[in-house]
Amino acid sequence: MRMRKKKNLDVRFAACADVMAFEPKEKRGKWRALFGNDNPIHLEIGCGKGRFAIGMAEQHPDVNFIAVEREEGALIMAAERCQQQPLPNLRFVSFDAAELREVFAPGEVDRIYLNFSDPWPPNRQRKRRLTWRAYLEVYDEILRQQGDLCFKTDNQRFFEWSLQEICQFGWLIQNISLDLHNSDFEGNVMTEYEEKFSAEGYRIYRLEARRRLPEDRKSVV
């Protein structure tokens, strides 16, 4: 279901200027300057209402977090939540994932989070899946050497498809969990969807995938 458009968005976003990053394409290659430090940059693509990004920024003050959400109705809720107690290491931004190359320079990002991305039907709309090879190629460009991707979902088929796609791309798969909430993984921060799905009895699947150097990738093809 598509979220209904919120009223007075321009005014509300302006009131959240302390936690927003407007005109993201102008910041390409300059994101660390925005934060005023050289700390690692972690990027969440599809942050929803911001629970995960805020929780991670609170837990890791030495990491800069950029939370992306194209649905402005959800993004304003995230920004207003954070605006109540702004975090210097977190910025929210609105753009489509297809524009990542225009927003981030090569090697500018240290880690990417994909949390409960839309599991578009694999036969008809697989190209819209954020773990599709074309997106992996983009991540491969904007991530630093040996940067990594963290992926969570409640959809087993989507998880298995993504695992295969990432393996075929040549990245190193690490820390797979087929039942995250009943594992020994520490430091998990839940999203709104994660809490809902877990309460309904769904398993949560998680993996980490590390970018390989080109010479290392040849050895596994």
Where are these regions (language model features)?
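Short alpha-helix immediately C-terminal to the canonical SAM-binding loop
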Residues: L75-M77, F159
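Conserved SAM/SAH-binding beta-strand->alpha-helix loop
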Residues: E71
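Class I S-adenosyl-L-methionine
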Residues: F158, S162, F169-K218
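S-adenosyl-L-methionine
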Residues: M1-I41, R51-E58, E80-P106
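Class I SAM-dependent methyltransferase "Motif I" SAM/SAH-binding loop
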Residues: G46-G48
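A short glycine-rich, Lys/Arg-flanked "PGG" loop and its adjoining helix->strand segment in the class I
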Residues: T131-Q145
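Conserved beta-strand signature within the Rossmann-like core of class I S-adenosyl-L-methionine
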Residues: Q146-T153
